[in-house]
From Swiss-Prot:
Protein name per its UniProtKB record: Small ribosomal subunit protein uS2
SUPFAM superfamilies to which the protein is assigned, alphabetical: Ribosomal protein S2
Keyword Ribosomal protein: yes
NCBIfam families, A to Z: uS2_euk_arch
């Protein structure tokens, strides 16, 4: 375990707190709390923008920001409900971070959407004369910092944007924020797996307690030797 991961370990009291609302009502998370924590979805950075302050659970003594798992779970539900309103084939997901390539590809396979992994070709959403021009109804980005070209184009033509945002994110032009560790390999796999499953639940393609045929591990980008 890295120093960063050690710094985000939670006490039993904190774990109990994260499974209840501020009024003390027990929350049923989309996956068990320990599953979220072991994937590191709550691990932030040493920087926090004012846009992300409302999603912070605590700040470690060394200055590392830790995200509130309850709010991650809540925003995954909000995003899934929002995305489910659009035609499956009109959902475009992009990722320029290598660790996000497999999660995005598997996610798009499950929800039957389109995806662009790697470099986002300029004009994809704005230049109808290009062969690769597409007209999605909603855009999902893995990281506003690295997927900026896609965000600029979507905002220019009025496409709503859903984004995974870490503590250091700027959220200009983002319509639906999912606060989360959008850099970690295991975190990205779990986030996209949960989002895919919840979208199918919202579409009523699977029961409210149903699962998808792929495992979280199937969404994980493999490390090269």
């Amino acid at each position: 375990m890295s120093e960063k991961e050690r710094g985000t370990e939670l006490s039993e009291e904190e774990k109990a707190e994260l499974q209840k609302t501020e009024k003390g009502t027990v929350i049923e998370l989309l996956v068990p709390l320990d599953t979220y924590l072991s994937a590191g979805v709550h691990i932030g950075t040493h920087t926090c923008t004012r846009y992300m302050e409302r999603f912070i659970y605590r700040v470690r003594p060394e200055g590392l920001y830790v995200l509130d798992v309850r709010k991650i779970d809540e925003r995954l539900r909000v995003a899934a409900k929002f995305i489910s309103r659009f035609r499956p084939e009109a959902v475009l997901t992009v990722a320029s971070r290598p660790y996000a390539f497999t999660p995005v590809q598997k996610f798009s396979e499950v929800v039957r959407g389109k995806e662009i992994s790697g470099r986002f070709p300029p004009g994809t959403l704005t230049n109808p004369y290009l062969d690769n021009y597409i007209e999605p109804e909603v855009l999902i980005v893995t990281d506003p910092r690295t997927d900026l070209q896609a965000i600029k184009e979507a905002s220019k033509v009025g496409i709503p944007i859903v984004a995974f945002t870490d503590t250091d994110a700027r959220v200009d032009f983002i319509d639906v924020i999912i606060p989360a560790n959008n850099k970690g390999r295991k975190s990205l796999a779990l986030l996209y797996w949960v989002l895919a499953r919840q979208i199918l639940r919202e579409r009523k393609e699977i029961p409210l307690d149903g699962d998808i045929p792929l495992r979280v591990e199937d969404f994980e980008t493999r490390l090269t030797e």
